[in-house]
UniProtKB/Swiss-Prot annotation:
Region ranges (Framework-2): 40-54
Chain intervals for the UniProt region annotation (Framework-3): 62-93
Lineage: Eukaryota, Metazoa, Chordata, Craniata, Vertebrata
Positions of disulphide bridges: C23-C93
A cellular component term, taken from the record's GO annotations: immunoglobulin complex
Keywords on record: Adaptive immunity, Disulfide bond, Hybridoma, Immunity, Immunoglobulin, Monoclonal antibody
Single annotated GO MF: antigen binding
Region (Complementarity-determining-1): 24-39
Protein's UniProt name: Ig kappa chain V-II region 7S34.1
Region (Complementarity-determining-2): 55-61
Organism: Mus musculus
Length: 113
Protein backbone atom coordinates (compact mmCIF):
# COMPACT_ATOMS: atom_id res chain seq x y z
CA UNK A 1 0.00 0.00 0.00
CA UNK A 2 1.08 3.60 -0.58
CA UNK A 3 1.93 5.28 2.72
CA UNK A 4 0.90 8.92 3.09
CA UNK A 5 2.83 10.93 5.68
CA UNK A 6 1.94 14.28 7.20
CA UNK A 7 4.80 15.09 9.55
CA UNK A 8 3.22 18.08 11.30
CA UNK A 9 0.32 17.00 13.52
CA UNK A 10 -0.77 20.59 14.12
CA UNK A 11 -0.29 24.18 12.99
CA UNK A 12 -1.05 27.34 14.95
CA UNK A 13 -1.74 30.38 12.78
CA UNK A 14 -2.70 34.01 13.31
CA UNK A 15 -5.74 35.14 11.28
CA UNK A 16 -4.64 36.83 8.07
CA UNK A 17 -1.37 34.93 7.87
CA UNK A 18 -0.52 32.16 5.44
CA UNK A 19 0.22 28.55 6.24
CA UNK A 20 1.54 25.57 4.30
CA UNK A 21 0.67 21.98 5.12
CA UNK A 22 2.89 19.25 3.74
CA UNK A 23 2.35 15.64 2.75
CA UNK A 24 4.59 12.95 1.30
CA UNK A 25 3.82 9.67 -0.44
CA UNK A 26 5.90 6.51 -0.40
CA UNK A 27 5.43 6.12 -4.16
CA UNK A 28 4.94 8.57 -6.99
CA UNK A 29 1.33 9.59 -7.50
CA UNK A 30 2.02 10.76 -11.05
CA UNK A 31 0.13 8.59 -13.53
CA UNK A 32 1.21 7.96 -17.11
CA UNK A 33 -1.80 10.02 -18.21
CA UNK A 34 -0.16 13.12 -16.72
CA UNK A 35 -2.43 13.44 -13.69
CA UNK A 36 -1.15 13.37 -10.12
CA UNK A 37 -3.72 11.64 -7.93
CA UNK A 38 -3.32 13.61 -4.72
CA UNK A 39 -6.33 15.10 -2.94
CA UNK A 40 -6.75 17.43 0.03
CA UNK A 41 -9.69 17.39 2.43
CA UNK A 42 -10.73 19.52 5.39
CA UNK A 43 -12.72 18.03 8.24
CA UNK A 44 -14.19 20.82 10.34
CA UNK A 45 -15.25 20.03 13.91
CA UNK A 46 -18.45 17.98 13.88
CA UNK A 47 -18.65 17.85 10.08
CA UNK A 48 -17.92 15.43 7.27
CA UNK A 49 -14.70 15.90 5.28
CA UNK A 50 -14.88 18.49 2.50
CA UNK A 51 -12.89 18.14 -0.71
CA UNK A 52 -10.59 21.14 -1.23
CA UNK A 53 -8.13 20.13 -3.94
CA UNK A 54 -8.24 17.32 -6.49
CA UNK A 55 -5.46 15.92 -8.67
CA UNK A 56 -2.85 17.89 -6.72
CA UNK A 57 -3.62 21.43 -7.85
CA UNK A 58 -7.26 21.77 -8.93
CA UNK A 59 -9.59 23.76 -6.70
CA UNK A 60 -12.86 21.98 -5.90
CA UNK A 61 -16.14 23.74 -6.60
CA UNK A 62 -17.07 26.36 -4.02
CA UNK A 63 -13.66 26.40 -2.33
CA UNK A 64 -12.15 29.89 -1.91
CA UNK A 65 -9.09 30.65 -4.01
CA UNK A 66 -7.18 31.30 -0.79
CA UNK A 67 -6.51 27.55 -1.00
CA UNK A 68 -3.97 26.17 -3.47
CA UNK A 69 -2.20 22.89 -4.01
CA UNK A 70 1.19 22.12 -5.49
CA UNK A 71 3.84 19.43 -5.48
CA UNK A 72 5.78 16.81 -7.36
CA UNK A 73 5.28 13.09 -7.65
CA UNK A 74 5.87 12.37 -3.97
CA UNK A 75 5.94 15.71 -2.08
CA UNK A 76 2.89 17.93 -1.83
CA UNK A 77 1.84 21.21 -0.24
CA UNK A 78 -1.50 22.75 0.59
CA UNK A 79 -1.18 26.50 1.03
CA UNK A 80 -3.81 28.66 2.69
CA UNK A 81 -3.35 32.39 2.30
CA UNK A 82 -5.10 34.87 4.58
CA UNK A 83 -6.23 32.26 7.08
CA UNK A 84 -9.71 32.80 8.52
CA UNK A 85 -11.41 31.43 11.62
CA UNK A 86 -13.56 29.14 9.45
CA UNK A 87 -10.43 27.33 8.25
CA UNK A 88 -9.96 25.48 11.55
CA UNK A 89 -10.12 21.72 11.41
CA UNK A 90 -8.03 18.75 10.37
CA UNK A 91 -6.48 18.70 6.89
CA UNK A 92 -5.89 15.34 5.24
CA UNK A 93 -4.07 14.37 2.09
CA UNK A 94 -5.22 11.27 0.23
CA UNK A 95 -3.92 9.30 -2.72
CA UNK A 96 -6.05 7.80 -5.45
CA UNK A 97 -3.13 6.57 -7.53
CA UNK A 98 -3.86 2.94 -6.67
CA UNK A 99 -6.05 0.78 -4.46
CA UNK A 100 -6.40 0.82 -1.57
CA UNK A 101 -6.77 4.59 -1.41
CA UNK A 102 -4.88 5.86 1.63
CA UNK A 103 -4.88 8.98 3.80
CA UNK A 104 -2.27 10.88 5.73
CA UNK A 105 -2.64 11.16 9.48
CA UNK A 106 -3.93 14.71 9.30
CA UNK A 107 -2.73 18.17 10.33
CA UNK A 108 -4.89 20.10 12.77
CA UNK A 109 -5.09 23.82 12.03
CA UNK A 110 -5.74 26.04 15.02
CA UNK A 111 -6.14 29.81 15.21
CA UNK A 112 -4.20 31.99 17.62
CA UNK A 113 -6.56 34.02 19.75
Amino acid sequence: DIVMTQTAPSALVTPGESVSISCRSSKSLLHSNGNTYLYWFLQRPGQCPQLLIYRMSNLASGVPDRFSGSGSGTAFTLRISRVEAEDVGVYYCMQQREYPYTFGGGTKLEIKR
